């Protein structure tokens, strides 16, 4: 097997053709890829009739990046922690560390968290770790929050900001949040239920590896910071297609982090409750209502809900839809092929159409599932796996 080298631009174009997302700027060194594991990949049973659920989420995108400032409502300090685009799970611990540090600076005797998605839950757990009693005020518990509709991929720069709208300090802040989150994820590896796990991801393309794709016109320039993490993530490997089961012109492989959303969220909820945390069901209609809480320091983790609650029109919805195929225990790798992403999880195999890149779903607030979209994505995969073979 020969070693291939690519320019950064060629690499990104190749990944885009395969449907790769997340850490898109992280140009990896290409290595000779041992094909032993690729020889024993299980095929996906890609049939539309195996879809048992379809969910839609609205990612809370802000051009300037997440909102992490503070404001006072009468005698109450509100610390904001929302607007993470498609990076909420990935940046959760790092962003919440910043928010909680601002909350603790007021030396409160107790802390309130509004919102019970992944940002709310990690904020609550970090405040508890600092010795503070915490009450989460929420309309929905975590298992029914928008966070549960995420794909489960580690994508810390997915729709995190626009390149020309962030402050000069933001790239370093993003790196700080990402590295802090990664240190926390490390502590969740190997736990029962595999809440966080390293898996292989295969980027399969019908185009030769060095094929260039013309840039799309009229696209927003979403920030991409993966190159700042080259010391952490494993090199990508170029595999000979003949050494893999895929009949394709180009096959690449790299290690990626995957979240088992169901088991991970249950673990976070359990930890919060064991530590004495309280959850109170409450819906806020005006920010001023937070001043009526007994806690005088509040961390606001309302996600896309902040657009209406805080009248923050800088929050733009980015619609995302995923279909769930019936789980296959033997299918344990992720895949990107023809603008379709596949992520194996214990609660279902996630299939997501990603054509259009980061602009897909931009400013679309529809929560209505599109069955045709999911069927088409699965049928695309069926064509790939219909030619699945034992490597020669």
Where are these predicted regions, by residue range?
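Flavin (FAD/FMN) cofactor-binding and adjacent substrate-gating region
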Residues: 14, 18, 54-75, 147-149, ...
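N-terminal secretory signal peptides and thylakoid transit peptides that target proteins
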Residues: 1-19
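Active-site substrate-recognition segment that forms the wall
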Residues: 30-74, 83, 89-97, 117-130, ...
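Short hydrophobic core segments
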Residues: 296-302
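Glycine-rich active-site loop/strand segments that organize a redox cofactor
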Residues: 140-177, 235-236
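A conserved short coil-to-beta-strand element within the FAD-binding core of flavoproteins
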Residues: 278-292
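Short beta-strand to alpha-helix junction loop
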Residues: 87-91, 170-177, 252-267, 368-372
